Amino acid sequence: RAFENSQTIYTPAVHPREPYITQREMFVSPFYEREKELGGHFENEVAGWERALAYISNREKLDKYIKEVPVRENEWDTRHVPYDVANAEHLAMSDSVGMINLSHFPIMDIKGPDAERMLEYLSVAKVGGNTPEGKVIYTNFLDEDGGVHADLTISRISNDSYRVVTGGADGNRDWVTLRNYRDDNGLNADINIRTHDIATLGLWGPKAVEALGNFINPNEIDIENFPFVSAKNLTLNLSGLSLIHISEPTRLAS
């Protein structure tokens, strides 16, 4: 990897999406083999995780959406990603429902007497105090100068327990921020990295609730029992399922 990175500095300019050749398939999700069967386009990875940017099996969606897909006139602008298929996938998801593998999103469970104090200091939004259990808070971490350091969601699991979900490439940086603040201030809080223990899928689109209702009790996920920015635990085929209602009408399942 060091050699590959050096080529982007000491040789002529390379494409910003030029894929790495070395150290591939370091981390893959439980859905990886199925994604490959669907023609997943895995040229690029994120923080060591293989991530499909589109699925060739969805090329047929271009029949419906081709007129809405932007034309990229330069070859350089179409390299390494099948943008036409990816655009059609997004348009189809906006009309109906789509599922995105987000297993590369870092997950950290934070628990302890000082968990609230630590997250309250680092977060812009209020995550402690009278914030109810099961509430999901979208927030930023700020640096000492007030600049945005991280963009993430925090779920309050119990009085002294939280789950932090951050961006795909930002997990180590945000973990270091949390660890350093805890250790520098002598706080009592356990930071448990769960990324490799939990598979995560995002369900997006106006028919997301309808689709999910085919597998679990629809009453469990209606707007009254599962409001916006809330989290709850359910069971799907005897497997534990952690649901987050993060946007409307979206469901995030881990």
Where are these regions (language model features)?
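Glycine/proline-enriched, intrinsically flexible loops and inter-domain linkers
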Residues: R1-L243, S247, R251
